[in-house]
From Swiss-Prot:
Ranges: CHCR repeats: 537-683, 686-828, 833-972, 979-1124, 1128-1269, 1274-1420, 1423-1566
UniProt-annotated stretches for the region Globular terminal domain: 2-479
UniProt region (Flexible linker), positions on chain: 480-523
Region (Trimerization): 1550-1675
Name of the protein in question: Clathrin heavy chain 1
Annotated region (WD40-like repeat 1), positions in chain: 24-67
Predominant location category: membrane
PROSITE patterns: CHCR
Positions where Phosphothreonine occurs in the chain: 105, 394
Residues carrying Phosphoserine: 67, 1167, 1229, 1494
Length: 1675
């Protein structure tokens, strides 16, 4: 059976499996501030990244592109601190925001989160704390001690309150790593240097101390060895005993001489110190005693970072392989381990008590029983109370303490036991009952309350029942804590806390009998019953049936309470609650009608029986409520006529709920019953509902009762809003009949809805005394003529004067017209006009009189108004008309009068005298009217003069429209008459613009020729000359040349450009030539006429440089390069040298180009010119001139020219140029092309450029100059990027030997790199495999192993392949290769060395199979090597299958110590086969893991007796005693048979063996069996058997021994019984605990307790002196 371990070891993840580069797993790049996150800085390609691994989701690492020197994650949240140089930043990753930043003055060499919001910063000189909250800067805590100078800082720790700070560093001194620490006290501000490697702080509460102590633990590996120190820092808190210092040795194995502590964490849960060393060892120490609990190696690699593992209260760390490992205390095993393995029961007890750990149950039980048996009840009580997991807190323990009587003057052991339990915490259920029973019997209820408040008792239903008889409220508290719903609710009801019942029931999910509860509550208090009932129905789903609840109310005749309950319960007005609503109203209508009225008034309910309630309301005198509920018309009419009993406002609203027919019937009934009383209410109803009842029906209703008063008031209420003409008419009628004349006037004046004709006729027939309503109607609706006739014929002339004077004076013209129609006297009319003068429209008056041809009637009145200074146009218009008709000098009036309306008077004159109409229209600038008159009467001369004088472009545009049929005669008059007469330039300008705007070019030319060519005032006008030429260009191009030659005062450049745009190139050329603009002239010839010959002739004629330049440019564009260059030379113009050079390059005119560039160089020393001149000289092969030129002063780009010459293969010229600028790289390339290899190599050496070396090298290879090629190649191969191309170049041409020679020569170079060694290895594999092994053995560390692996595999170099796999740590592939190619690759030592390192264990079994097939004699050696990781069961099964077990017997013997079943059985089978019974017996005794029964059954049939003996031994070992004894008897193994029978403890088997001995007459054996099986045999049976077989002599020694033992037992029993009687007599005189008058637990300080003996195993119990407070002492 495997040994139990006190720790649990776990690998959480492998960082390399998450894609983390192994090179980045180290102290400088990986941080772990807690067990939540791991943070790694990596570089992927050129990008720096930070990888954050959340330990709760490790398979999804977070990668962020962050370039920082260091990154540490917050211990709890996704907040990261970054350091880059001296800049510190804190970021919140989830919020994607920067929280804080700071720039330090010194470099931070180490930093660490010391809490959730504080970072510690360590510089070369000091330590700072930086809070991430607020805006605070880092705060300096202390300066670094000189002892840490030059140390690498590896950790920084603080205690829980950050009062003690510790900085840890290491340094190399005297071939060992020395640890240095600086301990700093914040309160004292002092430091202490300490030698140490790892340390931590812990809070530990010693037994007997009230406060925790701050402990400082540190480990050191000095020259003398390792030590762990545990000390208390600072002054112990008041009342605390100081913690005794501990210093224990730390064991380091002999093979780990250089090992030292690197990390320490302390488990607060278990008070265990975890110490980790550099070599991967873990040590566990007890914090209190310093005892080493366990030590083992957990990692082959250094664990360089650790943190507390919160989930297990252990330690978690990362090693250099990337394993994330954790170690914690195995709670189930640590106590048994300390007890059994360490043999330290004291420590086991201590830890079990202190940390509540299981595993020490037997120790505690043994100690308790021992103390109890000794009578040390006080210590026994402490042991029982302190035992972990409450293993001794059982009813049996309480009964044992109850059975012990209390000593006089002392507290009983039971109460001592309870006192200790109360000190420690809560009592369990049984303990609480047993303690409370005597407390309540003594009336100490307050003690119980105190314990409940302190949560010292475990509440139960039984405890509640016990308390209830004393205090129901306290019992309620107990039931609540015990969660006994039925008892809780019962107590709530009994104590009147009904409001809590429903809430509690819902909370715990309990459903009691609510109706039963309600009856009980109602019996006690109706008000509380009502409250409880309301709580039952307050939810959407009532807890009880509401009908049953109402029945309970009615049982106690609680109408008021029931009403209040139902009002609340039925407030949601559900359809299903209709019967309950009816019941509520019914009970109140019978007993409290006013309450019912209020309920109905609130309209809370709608689902009750309305008919039944209506009848009850009528009986109760609630007519209004009855009407609300009646649906039958008969019932409604019966009630509604009693209006004196009803609220009028309500009754009006009530009618809104009736149908139209029912409403009219009720109104009719009300009017019939008492019209005087009910008329007003009927009018109100009619007014409000007239739209629904229809106004017509209501009018007919009132008319049927001849109630014009009702009709007037009804219609008066709606007439202001009604649009019905009949309503307005009926209202006017009713008002007339009731004498309301003022209302008639108002409605006639304001209403727009009545029929005016109908009202007019009614008012005429009504013969009212006041005609004002009629006047209003006629005035509003234009019945003035009828009104005048009616009033004039009825001799009511005074109303006519009233009308025009007071009502509407503006109607005077119509009235005058009417009076003229009835032949009224002119004097009357004139007087009427004079009376109302100025308040009417003169135009209308004139129109009315004019229609009747009586205009002269107004002449005196008009002249009088003008005399008065009237400027009204209408007056003057009328006067003008009279003068025109009477021909009273009208033209003078029209020209001089400024007030008349020209348009009106002109219109009046059109048919009478067109000339007068023109005068009137011209005076008023009535353009359109004047044009129409002139056109109709052919007055074009007048019109043309008017238009010229008017100067209106829009007016011109209207008459010059093509659609105007009078345009031509008008234009003729304008040209011949109007413009000839004018001297105003503006009039001419407007006219010309008008012709231009109208697009009349021919007419415009005609007009302009008249003006310009006929020697008028405007002949030399520049704009008119321009306009004439431009118009000709547009309209008649044949005249353009004539105008150009005749006219001189025009804008020549502008006109010429316009001519060009209209393609009149010859005209343009003539203009330029006339005005000597030669450059423009030649431009026209070149660009527009396109005749270069004419241009050349023109250039020769004028011989101007600018003209030659333009001609040259044109010739260049046409490709006439030679001619163009000649022209440029004549122009002496080098400005276009770039275009000339490009054209000459394209056409190859190099000789001409040389001439041009030489001319250009004289003008301008441009770099471009000189550069192109050099290239032109090279192209013309003038190398001597070229060399002379470049050796002289110049600005040319010689390098650029050299490159061009090189590109065009002019190598001689290029050679001169490159040599001139010392470009040895290109010079070397040029020399290569010239075949001068040696000179090319020299040039390449001077250039020292990789590209040049490559070019020269490749050229030398092509020229088979391998010596020179190697010289070049040695400069190339040192560049890894160029190596592949060079190798391919050699290989493609088959020069393998030369390539290998070059690479071999290159290996000794200073800059030799991995690629060279790799490629040479690959070449060896292909072309010289015999050299590859030697090369690899020398340089395997400098080759790219994966590439060489592929090459070796392709070349079938299996030995070399294995060698590489081994060096590359691909051990699996190495083994596979050796097994696949044993002839070439297998070597025994190498195979056994590599096989132990493989990752895939399956290869072990393939290796076994391989050895079995090829090297069977070496198989055991292999198995010995494989055994640590081999599955022995599988291996044995395999060898059994292939029947080779004997071959591997040495292996099986070597691994049998694992006690493997398959191994054991296989070896046992081999021993049986070899008949080696001694080896078989040894194997069986040493290793028990095999099928015992099967082996025994097999051996019992074996031919050799020793094997059958082993079978009996096996049967015995498996409790098959009978088979074992029978087998011994069969083989006469008497001694074995007796021994096995004795060991069986089976009396029957022993007696059967005795009988068998007698049957076989083996009397000596009989005698021996009596003593061997002495304890099993019954004396009477032995006596009978011996007597019957007459062998008493053989049995006599047995009987003597039996008699001796029995007599001794009887003597002891007698003495014991006597002692017991004496004790009973002494006990009867002492009282029992419950008979005491006072509870011993509350006896107070007067009870003295003697000092107790200490616990066993070195455990010291806490001193028990004064009683502890909190148990009810000092009552």
């Amino acid at each position: 059976m495997a040994q139990i371990l006190p720790i649990r070891f776990q690998e959480h993840l492998q960082l390399q499996n998450l894609g983390i580069n192994p090179a980045n797993i180290g102290f400088s790049t990986l941080t772990m501030e807690s067990d939540k996150f791991i943070c790694i800085r990596e570089k992927v390609g050129e990008q720096a990244q930070v990888v954050i691994i959340d330990m709760n989701d490790p398979s999804n690492p977070i990668r962020r592109p962050i370039s920082a020197d260091s990154a540490i994650m917050n211990p709890a949240s996704k907040v990261i601190a970054l350091k880059a140089g001296k800049t510190l930043q804190i970021f919140n990753i989830e919020m994607k925001s920067k929280m804080k930043a700071h720039t330090m003055t010194d470099d931070v060499t180490f930093w660490k989160w010391i809490s959730l919001n504080t970072v510690a910063l360590v510089t070369d000189n000091a330590v700072y704390h930086w809070s991430m909250e607020g805006e605070s800067q880092p705060v300096k805590m202390f300066d670094r001690h000189s002892s840490l100078a030059g140390c690498q800082i590896i950790n920084y720790r603080t205690d829980a309150k950050q009062k003690w700070l510790l900085l840890t560093g290491i340094s190399a001194q005297q071939n060992r790593v020395v640890g240095a620490m600086q301990l700093y006290s914040v309160d004292r501000k002092v430091s202490q240097p300490i030698e140490g490697h790892a340390a931590s702080f812990a809070q530990f509460k010693m037994e007997g101390n009230a406060e925790e102590s701050t402990l400082f633990c540190f480990a050191v590996r000095g020259q003398a060895g390792g030590k762990l120190h545990i000390i208390e820092v600072g002054t112990p808190p008041t009342g605390n005993q100081p913690f005794p210092k501990k210093a224990v040795d730390v064991f380091f194995p002999p093979e780990a001489q250089n090992d030292f502590p690197v990390a320490m964490q302390i488990s607060e849960k278990h008070d265990v110190v975890f110490l980790i060393t550099k070599y991967g060892y873990i040590h566990l120490y007890d914090l209190e005693t310093g005892t080493c609990i366990y030590m083992n190696r957990i990692s082959g690699e250094t664990i360089f970072v650790t943190a507390p593992h919160e989930a297990t209260a252990g330690i978690i760390g990362v090693n250099r392989k990337g394993q994330v490992l954790s170690v914690c205390v195995e709670e189930e095993n640590i106590i048994p381990y300390i007890t059994n393995v360490l043999q330290n029961p004291d420590l086991a007890l201590r830890m079990a008590v202190r940390n509540n750990l299981a595993g020490a149950e037997e120790l505690f039980a043994r100690k308790f029983n021992a103390l109890f048996a000794q009578g040390n009840y006080s210590e026994a009580a402490k042991v029982a109370a302190n035992a972990p997991k409450g293993i001794l807190r059982t009813p049996d323990t309480i009964r044992r303490f109850q059975s012990v009587p209390a000593q006089p003057g002392q507290t009983s052991p039971l109460l001592q036991y309870f006192g200790i339990l109360l000190d420690q915490g809560q009592l369990n259920k049984y303990e609480s009952l047993e303690l409370c029973r005597p407390v309540l019997q003594q009336g100490r209820k307050q003690l119980l309350e105190k314990w409940l408040k302190e949560d010292k008792l475990e509440c139960s239903e039984e405890l509640g029942d016990l308390v209830k008889s004393v205090d129901p409220t306290l019992a309620l508290s107990v039931y609540l804590r015990a969660n006994v719903p039925n008892k809780v609710i019962q107590c709530f009801a009994e104590t009147g806390q009904v409001q809590k019942i429903v809430l509690y029931a819902k909370k715990v999910g309990y459903t009691p009998d609510w109706i039963f509860l309600l009856r009980n509550v109602m019996r006690i208090s109706p008000d509380q019953g009502q409250q409880f009932a309301q709580m039952l129905v307050q939810d959407e789903e009532p807890l009880a049936d509401i009908t049953q609840i109402v029945d309970v109310f009615m049982e106690y005749n609680l109408i008021q309470q029931c009403t209040a309950f139902l009002l609340d319960a039925l407030k949601n007005n559900r359809p299903s609650e209709g019967p309950l609503q009816t019941r509520l109203l019914e009970m109140n209508l019978m007993h409290a009608p006013q309450v019912a009225d209020a309920i109905l008034g609130n309209q809370m309910f709608t689902h009750y029986d309305r008919a039944h309630i209506a009848q009850l309301c009528e009986k109760a005198g609630l007519l209004q409520r009855a009407l609300e509920h009646f649906t039958d018309l008969y019932d409604i009419k019966r009630a509604v006529v009693h209006t004196h009993l009803l609220n009028p406002e309500w009754l009006v609203n009530y009618f809104g709920s009736l149908s139209v027919e029912d409403s009219l019937e009720c109104l009719r009934a009300m009017l019939s019953a008492n019209i005087r009383q009910n008329l007003q209410i009927c009018v109100q109803v009619a007014s409000k509902y007239h739209e629904q009842l229809s106004t017509q029906s209501l009018i007919e209703l009132f008319e049927s009762f001849k109630s014009f008063e009702g009709l007037f008031y009804f219609l008066g209420s709606i007439v202001n809003f009604s649009q019905d003409p009949d309503v307005h008419f009926k209202y006017i009628q009713a008002a007339c009949k009731t004498g309301q004349i003022k209302e008639v006037e108002r409605i006639c004046r304001e209403s727009n809805c009545y029929d005016p004709e109908r009202v007019k006729n009614f008012l005429k027939e009504a013969k009212l005394t006041d005609q004002l309503p009629l006047i209003i109607v006629c005035d509003r609706f234009d019945f003035v003529h009828d009104l005048v006739l009616y009033l004039y014929r009825n001799n009511l002339q005074k109303y006519i004067e009233i009308y025009v004077q007071k009502v509407n004076p503006s109607r005077l013209p119509v009235v005058i017209g009417g009076l003229l129609d009835v032949d009224c006297s002119e004097d009357v009319i004139k007087n009427l006009i004079l009376v109302v003068r100025g308040q009417f429209s003169t135009d209308e008056l004139v129109a009315e009189v004019e229609k009747r041809n009586r205009l002269k009637l107004l002449l005196p009145w008009l002249e009088a108004r003008i005399h008065e200074g009237c400027e009204e146009p209408a007056t003057h218009n009328a006067l003008a008309k009279i003068y025109i008709d009477s021909n009273n000098n009208p033209e003078r009036f029209l020209r001089e009068n400024p007030y008349y309306d020209s348009r009106v008077v002109g219109k009046y004159c059109e048919k009478r005298d067109p000339h007068l109409a023109c005068v009137a229209y011209e005076r008023g600038q009535c353009d359109l009217e004047l044009i129409n008159v002139c056109n109709e009467n052919s007055l074009f001369k007048s019109l043309s003069r008017y238009l010229v004088r008017r100067k209106d472009p829009e007016l011109w545009g209207s008459v010059l429209l093509e659609s105007n049929p009078y345009r031509r005669p008008l234009i003729d008059q304008v040209v011949q008459t109007a413009l000839s007469e004018t001297q105003d330039p503006e009039e001419v300008s407007v006219t010309v613009k008008a012709f231009m705007t109208a697009d009349l070019p021919n007419e415009l030319i005609e007009l302009l020729e008249k003006i310009v060519l006929d020697n008028s005032v405007f002949s030399e006008h520049r704009n008119l000359q321009n306009l004439l030429i431009l118009t000709a260009i547009k309209a008649d191009r044949t005249r353009v040349m004539e105008y150009i030659n005749r006219l001189d005062n025009y804008d020549a450049p502008d006109i010429a450009n316009i001519a060009i745009s209209n393609e009149l190139f010859e005209e343009a050329f003539a203009i330029f030539r006339k005005f000597d603009v030669n450059t423009s002239a030649v431009q026209v010839l070149i660009e527009h006429i396109g005749n270069l010959d004419r241009a050349y002739e023109f250039a020769e004629r004028c011989n101007e440089p600018a003209v030659w330049s333009q001609l040259a440019k044109a010739q260049l564009q046409k490709g006439m390069v030679k001619e163009a260059i000649d022209s440029y030379i004549k122009a002496d113009d080098p400005s276009s040298y770039m275009e000339v050079v490009q054209a000459a390059n394209a056409s190859g005119n190099w000789e001409e180009l040389v001439k041009y560039l030489q001319m250009a160089r004289k003008k301008a020393r441009e770099s471009y010119v000189e550069t192109e001149l050099i290239f032109a000289l090279a192209k013309t092969n003038r190398l001597a001139e070229l060399e002379e030129f470049i050796n002289g002063p110049n600005n040319a780009h010689i390098q650029q020219v050299g490159d061009r010459c090189y590109d065009e293969k002019m190598y001689d010229a290029a050679k001169l140029l490159y040599n001139n600028v010392s470009n040895f790289g290109r010079l070397a390339s040029t020399l290569v092309h010239l075949g001068e290899y040696q000179a090319a190599v020299d040039g390449a050496r001077k250039a020292n450029s990789t590209r040049t070396w490559k070019e020269v090298c490749f050229a030398c290879v092509d020229g088979k100059e391998f010596r020179l090629a190697q010289m070049c190649g040695l400069h190339i191969v040192v560049h890894a990027d160029e190596l592949e191309e060079l190798i391919n170049y050699y290989q493609d041409r088959g020069y393998f030997e030369e390539l290998i020679t070059m690479l071999e020569a290159a290996l000794g170079l200073e800059r030799a790199h991995m690629g060279m060694f790799t490629e040479l290895a690959i070449l060896y594999s292909k072309f010289k495999p015999q050299k590859m092994r030697e090369h690899l053995e020398l340089f395997w560390s400098r080759v790219n192993i994966p590439k060489v692996l592929r090459a070796a595999e392709q070349a079938h170099l299996w030995a070399e392949l294995v060698f590489l796999y081994d060096k590359y740590e691909e051990y699996d592939n190495a083994i596979i290769t050796m097994m696949n190619h044993p002839t070439d690759a297998w070597k025994e030592g190498q195979f056994k060395d590599i096989i132990t390192k493989v990752a895939n264990v399956e290869l072990y079994y393939k290796a076994i199979q391989f050895y079995l097939e090829f090297k069977p004699l070496l198989l055991n050696d292999l198995l010995m090597v494989l055994s640590p990781r081999l599955d022995h069961t599988r291996a044995v099964n395999y060898f059994s299958k292939v029947k080779q077990l004997p071959l591997v017997k040495p292996y099986l013997r070597s691994v049998q110590n694992h006690n493997n079943k398959s191994v054991n059985e296989s070896l046992n089978n081999l021993f049986i086969t070899e008949e080696d019974y001694q080896a078989l017996r040894t194997s069986i005794d040493a290793y028990d893991n095999f099928d015992n029964i099967s082996l025994a059954q097999r051996l019992e049939k074996h031919e050799l007796i020793e094997f059958r003996r082993i079978a009996a031994y096996l049967f015995k070992g498996n409790n098959r005693w009978k088979q074992s004894v029978e087998l011994c008897k069969k083989d006469s193994l008497y001694k074995d048979a007796m021994q096995y029978a004795s060991e069986s403890k089976d009396t029957e088997l022993a007696e059967e063996l005795l009988q068998w001995f007698l049957q076989e007459e083996k009397r000596e054996c009989f005698g021996a069996c009596l003593f061997t099986c002495y304890d099993l045999l019954r004396p009477d049976v032995v006596l009978e058997t011996a007597w019957r077989h007459n062998i008493m002599d053989f049995a006599m020694p047995y009987f003597i021994q039996v008699m001796k033992e029995y007599l001794t037992k009887v003597d002891k029993l007698d003495a014991s019984e006597s002692l017991r009687k004496e004790e009973e007599q002494a006990t009867e005189t002492q009282p029992i605990v419950y008979g005491q008058p006072q509870l011993m637990l509350t006896a107070g300080p007067s009870v003295a307790v003697p000092p107790q003996a200490p616990f066993g195993y070195g455990y010291t119990a806490p001193p028990y002196g004064q009683p502890q407070p909190g148990f009810g002492y000092s009552m």
